[in-house]
């Protein structure tokens, strides 16, 4: 009975934290989307501001399933709203890699959880990859989605092929910064959850 109650409590906690992550993603996305520079910074901004939620998700639930669900959710939204449907092809591997890294530290090793978050934060790149691999189709879908030609022209000009690795490295860096501040801000909560 106790195990069942604990399992139910973990499921509720995971649901709340996944929802909080999704809201963080959605709010940053809504603010970023019309502005080219913010649009390209979006994976980095989400990595930074969602870090506390991610670390609490690991600490409170120790759930592999929760990590994968959180990773995939934004890509499902992208596909559901008519974006080019390759987003899950990046989100799923990112979630699985993040899950194995966190699991390797039994979800309580803060260093491994930090590395896990770095790879987890690549989950959004499925929405950006078409800028390079399906360039014309991407800009057509953006126009159909209601953004203007000037947005497309600016993003096109700012995204030579070398910008992709720059964005990935930037996301890793912002993820590290987010994890650093998480440890500073939520230190007591993480300690009480047994995260070292």
Tell me what each language-model feature is:
Residues 1-3, 8, 186-196:
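Short, charged juxtamembrane terminal tails flanking transmembrane helices
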Residues 28-36, 61, 65, 85, ...:
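Membrane-interfacial segments
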């Amino acid at each position: 009975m106790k195990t069942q109650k604990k399992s139910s409590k973990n499921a509720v906690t995971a649901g709340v934290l996944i929802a909080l992550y999704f809201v963080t993603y959605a709010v940053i996305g809504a603010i970023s989307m019309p502005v080219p520079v913010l649009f390209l910074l979006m994976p980095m901004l989400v990595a930074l501001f969602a870090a506390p939620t991610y670390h609490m998700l690991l600490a409170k639930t120790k759930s592999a399933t929760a990590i994968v669900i959180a990773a995939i959710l934004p890509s499902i939204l992208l596909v559901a709203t008519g974006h080019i449907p390759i987003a899950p092809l990046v989100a799923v591997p990112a979630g699985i890699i993040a899950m194995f890294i966190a699991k390797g530290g039994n979800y309580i090793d803060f260093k491994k959880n930090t590395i896990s978050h770095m790879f987890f934060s690549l989950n959004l790149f499925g929405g950006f990859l078409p800028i390079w691999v399906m360039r014309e189709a991407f800009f057509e879908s953006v126009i159909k989605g209601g953004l203007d030609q000037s947005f497309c022209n600016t993003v096109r000009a700012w995204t030579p092929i070398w910008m992709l690795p720059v964005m990935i490295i930037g996301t890793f860096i912002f993820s590290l910064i987010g994890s650093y501040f998480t440890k500073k801000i939520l230190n007591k909560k993480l300690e009480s959850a047994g995260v070292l």
